[in-house]
Amino acid sequence: MSCPYAGNGNDHDDSAVPLTTEVGKIYGEYLMLDKLLDAQCMLSEEDKRPVHDEHLFIITHQAYELWFKQIIFEFDSIRDMLDAEVIDETKTLEIVKRLNRVVLILKLLVDQVPILETMTPLDFMDFRKYLAPASGFQSLQFRLIENKLGVLTEQRVRYNQKYSDVFSDEEARNSIRNSEKDPSLLELVQRWLERTPGLEESGFNFWAKFQESVDRFLEAQVQSAMMEPVEKAKNYRLMDIEKRREVYRSIFDPAVHDALVRRGDRRFSHRALQGAIMITFYRDEPRFSQPHQLLTLLMDIDSLITKWRYNHVIMVQRMIGSQQLGTGGSSGYQYLRSTLSDRYKVFLDLFNLSTFLIPREAIPPLDETIRRKLVHKSV
């Protein structure tokens, strides 16, 4: 197959030398364009009342589903690479590359929403009656993306029925069940973080050193507050320091952390959270450079999915208002708005790491043993 965009602009070039004598597929055959470009069936046209914007609606959603397929393809490969006891530098680099690809795809999907918004509410109303009972709620691939990423069933907002019950065919339900049982990206990243070098109590023991640094940092703040000449200002500062102390206690006390996990306010295990904090502090060390990029990209993915949900919510409100039911029977706008909460944010703990930062000068210094260990780039 030759690419029509790679030549010099001429349709025919008698001097061209074929790279192979084998007969290959031409462009349209390779991409199966006959099937792809014949998959836009306008129901308004079948009803002899063609609505121009229905074609845009179909094309846009088909494009979403194609990109969803690519995201799933990337997630599955990343999960395979993470599902190992040791991940060397080449694999980490490949994981970062593929996560970045997902980020760029999601940016593209966010930017597709304004194209749909070129359609007015009245234009949409002209063909909306043909859509029922179809609904974006029935996008199997988007549900698989959520599950493979790590959205927990118990965290989902439930409307009318369980999310998997909207799929009538058994194959789709099996796909949902398998995606719920298979290790998610969240689970695999958690296992990986738990193995962060430097957490070992018999080694560098970062967590104990971090606690000592926090205690010294807070004590220095208390001493500074006690020198405040205005009593009201002094009491305010002391109260603020005590609140910060309670925040730190939520990560230093395993029982408090586990209670927050059970409540749904945290996602990572206590050990994994320690690993994430350590990588954040020492991200300039060679061994932690790529892991830090990986964690940043996971937050980017969460952020972009949230942006996509938000853009979708605003578009739905523009098209059908906030009171109507969706075409699939869900509460439309109200349901979509409820998915914008932190309960759908998979890597919530990474966003909240900044809560536990301390000044750079207070970060525990690395000893020579761990510094040498962090020069070798495999995690």
Curated annotation (Swiss-Prot):
Query: Which positions are annotated as binding substrate?
Result: F57, I58, I59, T60, H61, R128, T327
Question: Which terms does the UniProt entry file under GO BP?
Answer: L-tryptophan catabolic process to acetyl-CoA; L-tryptophan catabolic process to kynurenine; ommochrome biosynthetic process; protein homotetramerization
GO MF: heme binding; metal ion binding; tryptophan 2,3-dioxygenase activity
* Cofactor names: heme
Q: What is its EC number?
A: 1.13.11.11
Keywords, in A-Z order: Dioxygenase, Heme, Iron, Metal-binding, Oxidoreductase, Tryptophan catabolism
Cofactor detail note: Binds 1 heme group per subunit.
Transcription listed as a keyword: no
Task: Show the catalytic activity.
Answer: L-tryptophan + O2 = N-formyl-L-kynurenine
The enzyme's main class, written as a single word, is oxidoreductase
Metabolic or biological pathway: Amino-acid degradation; L-tryptophan degradation via kynurenine pathway; L-kynurenine from L-tryptophan: step 1/2; Pigment biosynthesis; ommochrome biosynthesis
Q: Which Pfam families match?
A: Trp_dioxygenase
In this chain, heme is annotated as bound at H312
HAMAP family linked: T23O
How does this polypeptide assemble, per the annotation? Homotetramer. Dimer of dimers.
Q: What does this protein do?
A: Heme-dependent dioxygenase that catalyzes the oxidative cleavage of the L-tryptophan (L-Trp) pyrrole ring and converts L-tryptophan to N-formyl-L-kynurenine. Catalyzes the oxidative cleavage of the indole moiety.
Q: What is this protein called?
A: Tryptophan 2,3-dioxygenase
Species of origin reads: Drosophila erecta
Its gene name is v
